[in-house]
Each structure stands twice: as structure tokens, then as C-alpha cells.
Amino acid sequence: MSLHHTSPTPIAAAVLTQLAAIAGRWPSPKVRRLHIPRRPGEPGEHDAEFCAIELEDGAFGLSYILLGHTLDRLLAHHGSGRSDALADADPMALAQRLADGDEVERAVALAAVNALTDSVWRRVGYTPPPAGNSLGDVVLGPQDHLGMIGFFPPLVRRVDEAGGRLTVVEMNAGMVARQQERFPNILVTLDRAALAGCNTVVGTSTMLLNDSLDEMLAAAPAAQRFAVIGPSAGLWPDALFDRGVTLLGGTQVVDGAAFAAAMAAGESWSGASRKFAITRGSWPGWRQIAGL
């Protein structure tokens, strides 16, 4: 029996409606700055690059920026060395572009959504549960047929160790070719219909940027567990849980100065952050957390 639900409201609209309701109780601070990583040295050298919005209260929100030419355009518009990019901007206004913006606007919008979420969580004293493993508490056994949306090399090893089956759905042909070369024994495809037989699905939060989450949920009717994980998954989870997502695994920045320095230097910022995992069954709901 599928755990999925259907919702007529586009996910971006649901997220923005929720943010507006929360902002009535918890007005948002302005943007302190947009953090952009140093440009990758060679095409394909980095599989994951993120930008971050920092708010004046020290809250952070992350977003993936390797879709299309997002990174190039962000660098052209703001430059990784600019210390005042988007300073004093209204994060609620930036967030609105999640619904109808271009690839750059949507990336910045998701970072703003995540920063707004982090800001309220900090103010109300909510700390999301720590992730028990690097993949958002996803536990696998030999009976599992895992579907991956986007590529998680650590999960490939974990499936192999557990003796389970693995199907990978990628979102661009270039990544399919690269991953098939790296892992020739794994099915890597652009066809989301390949998820039909998977009982567990793990997808990157990039699905929020390219608006593919609802399509992927529909393509995996047998999935009893559907996790959305990654640094971009730092938002209130209600809209995702309403659709059938069972786990949200995100990243919180815990040392803003160290994070900013690492991103500016093109170094790993994992030591300045913590991974968390929120399950649908344990989530009390946004109204209770926000005191609404």
C-alpha cells in the first residue's frame, strides 16, 4: 500500500503560503549577504556546489546551484568575492521566485526559504533531530529495491553491502553518461518510470528546484519510504510530508563565520554544519513549532 498523498496545490505555492502565515507571527530579518562558492576549476570537477543566504540574525539557508548555468550566472551577477551581494534584501520577496522564477531566481529563492525556516527555528528554540548517518537516517536491507534520484556514491556502497537492488534516475544526460562510466553495473537512466518497482526512494532536494518532486512521487507508487535529502532540504517539511515524503534530511549551519570562510576559500564547510533528519511520523507540525 502506497503512503503517498496527492495535492492539487503546487508545492512552491504551498511552501510560500506557509511562510507568509509564519511571517505574521515571526517577521523576517533582512539578508546580510549571499555567499557564492569559488568557481570550479574544471567542468564536472564538483558534483555538488551550493550557495547560501545569510540573514541578519545569523540564520543560513543553502541551495544547489549546478542546475543549468546557475553557478555561472550567479558569479556573473554577484561575484564570489562581493561581501554585500543581496545585502538588505527582503528574503520573503526573494522566496516568491520559487514559484515562477528562472533557474537563478529559483536557486536564490530556495536558499531564502531555507534561511527563513532556520531563522524561525532558532528563535523558537527548535533543533531538528540529528541524522544518525550521512544519508539522513536511510537504513537498507537485502529486501530493499532502492531508487536514487540524483547520485549518492555513499548509498551505492551501502546498497552493495546490504545486498539490495539499486536503480538511479538522473536529471540530465551528461550525468547519466558520467555515472554509467563510473558504475557500469548499475542501472542509471533518465526515465523516472524505472522507479515503479522501488520500495525505498531517496532523492536530492534538487527536485524542489526543477519542480519534479510530484512527478517523482507519482513514478514510485510502491515506495513505502521516500526521503528528500541534501543541503537544500532545510525548509519546513509540511508541504513535502503532505505529498507522501516520509523523511526530510537537511543541513544546518552552526558556525556562520567558519562556514563563510570555507565557502569563500572553496574548501569543505561540513565542519561548520550539522546534518538533521525529520521523519513524518515524529513531526509535530509547523503550527505547533511556530506557536500558531
Regions found by a protein language model. Name each.
Residues 225-292:
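C-terminal functional extensions of proteins
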Residues 152, 172, 232:
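Residues in the short beta-alpha loop(s) of Rossmann-like NAD(P)-binding domains
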Residues 147, 200-204, 227:
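Structural motif
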Residues 164-179:
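NAD(P)-binding Rossmann-fold cofactor-contacting core
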Residues 134-135, 185-197:
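Short acidic low-complexity segments
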Residues 140-141, 159-162, 195-196, 218-223:
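Short, conserved loop/helix-junction motifs that constitute active-site signature segments
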Residues 2-161, 278-292:
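Electropositive, gly/pro-rich neighborhoods at or near active sites that engage anionic ligands
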Residues 155-158, 212-219, 239:
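A short acidic, amphipathic alpha-helical/loop segment
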